[in-house]
Amino acid sequence: MKTKFIFITGGVLSSLGKGLAAASIGALLKARGLKVTIQKLDPYINVDPGTMNPFQHGEVYVTDDGAETDLDLGHYERYLGESLSQKNNYTSGSIYNRVITKERRGDYLGGTVQVIPHVTDEIKNAILGLAEDEPDVALIEIGGTVGDIEGLPFLEAIRQLRGDLGKDHCLYVHLTLVPYLKAAGEHKTKPTQHSVKELRSIGIQPDIILCRCEKAISAELKRKIALFCDVDQDAVFSSVDVDNIYEVPLRFYEEGFDQKIAIMLRLPAKNANLESWETLIHTCSHPEGQVTIGIVGKYVDLKEAYKSLHEALIHGGVANKVKVNLRYVNSEEITEANVAEKLAGCDGILVPGGFGHRGVEGKIRSIRHAREHKIPFFGICLGMQCAVIEYARNVLGLADANSEEFNELTDNKVIYLMTEWYDFRKGAVERRDASSDKGGTLRLGAYPCVVVPGTRAWDAYGAERVDERHRHRFEFNKAYFEAMAEKGLVFSGLSPDGELVEIVELPDHPWFLGCQFHPEFKSNPMRPHPLFREFIKAAKKEAMGGKKGK
């Protein structure tokens, strides 16, 4: 097998940044001319994160093939500039589901099904499946923290793989915390020592230790960690806190991280070309201005719920050479009386996707404020649906206009449940109703959109047909198409068969656009998404116009 595998584990505590570390390593190896892929293995029992509460899990990231995945896949795609798929994310739930399906089918010939070998073999199959596309390197991030009971089958599987594939084909990287105690004025290595001890008790000896820390650790401290953790001194690296997450690949490169990996895995000795990353950081560090974007949502207390959105707005800032300041506004707190105060100073207003009726009226009030005061507005998924509801109520005069999701009894369901649509990937019509399961039953993944010439959407894309990622079960009710068009709403993007509305906009507004899809999932720092580029461009014009007091 030509593929080399790098396994990334984490210790001491969660949220150390394994996903960013894996993505940054992948970016460095790709910059060396290698073909790279990345996989995330999540220990939770849910089959996928599709029905999980955003406050617990954060964003659900959607791939082209319709997989609902961990938000770390967003980091992977943004840093690699590659499209990933379902096989790049597995959970304990999906692994156990496969095992149980095989048992019910009789594949195990009546044998007793156990964690070892059946579950661990299924995990190994998922990992080795990455080699089918023949990448030079496959990075596998093990979710959770070493010592968690849920993660033990995954750790056992990657322990076995080194024996299966050989030492030249496997590398273990352990990310750990090295806290800095200000009172003592020094870093402490004991948490790292205990974390590695826990990992070794499972049978895994890390080859490289990556130390998450506030400031770079000294050579003396690296020697100490190397001694007690039984690794080479030049295999201990710092992962220092940075102001901009896109600096991480450059920091790793300065430490020689990619070179050490190349030596240990006997990869081609080619220097990394990081010119595009250096240009990116220079642009971020030297903005020509700044804009403030108000994000009106209900998950604002956990910024991870809007992770890709946050990054896509930053990308839009890079394209326009401005710093983007994000102000998160809780939609549940917005009233008719305070909407102007809540959104004062915003150069642009964005209403993101979401589910459920909570906070919807605050979003609709925000959209009306943006429309009437000519503030650039961008609505995504539910944000587009709310824009349609607002227009129906306040322009068409349909006071009870609503979505079937929020009010099943209204006479004017301008947004209603999708009951069928054509899935071009399957070549078949998908059908749903109100009794369908919630998990995995939305319109998911990349679908084509036909863009109407002469519109803002056309100006952004410069193309007649684009593919965008979706995650929704409600849609615009075409019974209101003509009435809204007569009142000035432009339908600038439709499905190829003309049945589904994908983009709406207002031509007599500085920039007012809503889309049913999630463009944030297809934006990366090197190629900002056209709609985010144009939205920030309009916000920049608003900021330069000095109209913040409106």
From Swiss-Prot:
Region Amidoligase domain: start-end pairs: 1-267
Active-site residues, as the UniProt record annotates them: 381, 518, 520
Residues that bind CTP: 14, 148-150, 188-193, 224
Binding site residues for ATP: 15-20, 72
Domain Glutamine amidotransferase type-1: 292-545
BP-aspect Gene Ontology terms: 'de novo' CTP biosynthetic process; pyrimidine nucleobase biosynthetic process
Gene3D superfamilies linked to this entry: 3.40.50.880, P-loop containing nucleotide triphosphate hydrolases
Primary enzyme class: ligase
Activity regulation info: Allosterically activated by GTP, when glutamine is the substrate; GTP has no effect on the reaction when ammonia is the substrate. The allosteric effector GTP functions by stabilizing the protein conformation that binds the tetrahedral intermediate(s) formed during glutamine hydrolysis. Inhibited by the product CTP, via allosteric rather than competitive inhibition.
Coiled coil spans: none
EC number: 6.3.4.2
Binding-site list for UTP: 14, 188-193, 224
Keywords assigned by UniProt, alphabetized: ATP-binding, Glutamine amidotransferase, Ligase, Magnesium, Metal-binding, Nucleotide-binding, Pyrimidine biosynthesis
Pathway: Pyrimidine metabolism; CTP biosynthesis via de novo pathway; CTP from UDP: step 2/2
Annotated Mg(2+) binding sites: 72, 141
Tagged with keyword tRNA processing: no
Annotated L-glutamine binding sites: 354, 382-385, 405, 473
GO cellular component: cytosol
Additional record remark: CTPSs have evolved a hybrid strategy for distinguishing between UTP and CTP. The overlapping regions of the product feedback inhibitory and substrate sites recognize a common feature in both compounds, the triphosphate moiety. To differentiate isosteric substrate and product pyrimidine rings, an additional pocket far from the expected kinase/ligase catalytic site, specifically recognizes the cytosine and ribose portions of the product inhibitor.
Cross-referenced NCBIfam families: PRK05380.1 (NF003792), PyrG (TIGR00337)
Family: Belongs to the CTP synthase family.
Subunit structure comment from the entry: Homotetramer.
Known function: Catalyzes the ATP-dependent amination of UTP to CTP with either L-glutamine or ammonia as the source of nitrogen. Regulates intracellular CTP levels through interactions with the four ribonucleotide triphosphates.
Name of the protein this chain belongs to: CTP synthase
Naturally occurring in which organism (per UniProt): Nitratidesulfovibrio vulgaris (strain DSM 19637 / Miyazaki F) (Desulfovibrio vulgaris)
